[in-house]
């Protein structure tokens, strides 16, 4: 539970400064920042429900999953063409130096967002139908969110999990991508 809360908090902190980063951003840099803010807001709005602080609302989870999925995958990667690392951007050069890993993370977010929608029928903290083997579900733990050597998350297995656990995986994907590919700004 503490690890889940720490992950959600860290993920929230990593994206909390995005709004301030819009100063001077134009064109595609501004477009991708707007997409990241939409994802940040989605995670922020769903966090109290996933922590049990507000009543569970399946429709809110479905809306959030759709928003995450809409900004992930190819939609996300299209917003990072080479040469779009101007001064207003928080994108690190590593995105273009290790495009395969960045692209894999964007695709993982899309998979996990789809699984979040599927898991919406599994309220937070509900029992899973059978034991979950994390090595097949998420490529061996942290590696799922990181490098390109991980196996892809199993969307069917994720969809069987309690929705709060799938939400945590989504937050971990965001956090891992930001850790590797987003520059820190003061």
Predicted features, each with a name:
Residues 22-53, 58, 62, 66, ...:
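Sequence context surrounding c-type heme c attachment/ligation sites in exported
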Residues 1-9:
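Bacterial N-terminal signal peptides that target proteins for export
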Residues 8-16:
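Bacterial N-terminal signal peptides
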Residues 2, 16-26:
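Extracytoplasmic entry segments of secretory-pathway proteins
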């Amino acid at each position: 539970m503490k690890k889940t809360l720490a992950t959600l908090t860290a993920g929230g902190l990593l994206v909390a400064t995005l709004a301030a980063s819009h100063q001077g951003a134009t064109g595609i840099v501004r477009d991708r920042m707007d997409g990241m803010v939409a994802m940040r807001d989605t995670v922020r709005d769903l966090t109290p429900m996933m922590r049990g602080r507000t009543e569970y609302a399946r429709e809110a989870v479905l809306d959030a999953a759709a928003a995450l999925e809409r900004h992930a995958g190819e939609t996300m990667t299209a917003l990072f063409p080479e040469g779009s690392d101007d001064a207003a951007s928080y994108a690190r050069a590593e995105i273009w130096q290790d495009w395969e890993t960045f692209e894999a993370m964007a695709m993982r977010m899309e998979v996990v967002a789809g699984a979040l929608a599927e898991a919406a029928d599994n309220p937070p903290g509900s029992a899973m139908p059978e034991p979950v083997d994390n090595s097949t579900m998420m490529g061996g733990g942290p590696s799922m969110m990181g490098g390109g050597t991980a196996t892809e998350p199993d969307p069917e297995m994720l969809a069987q999990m309690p929705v709060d656990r799938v939400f945590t995986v989504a937050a971990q994907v965001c956090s891992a991508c930001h850790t590797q590919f987003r520059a820190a700004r003061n």
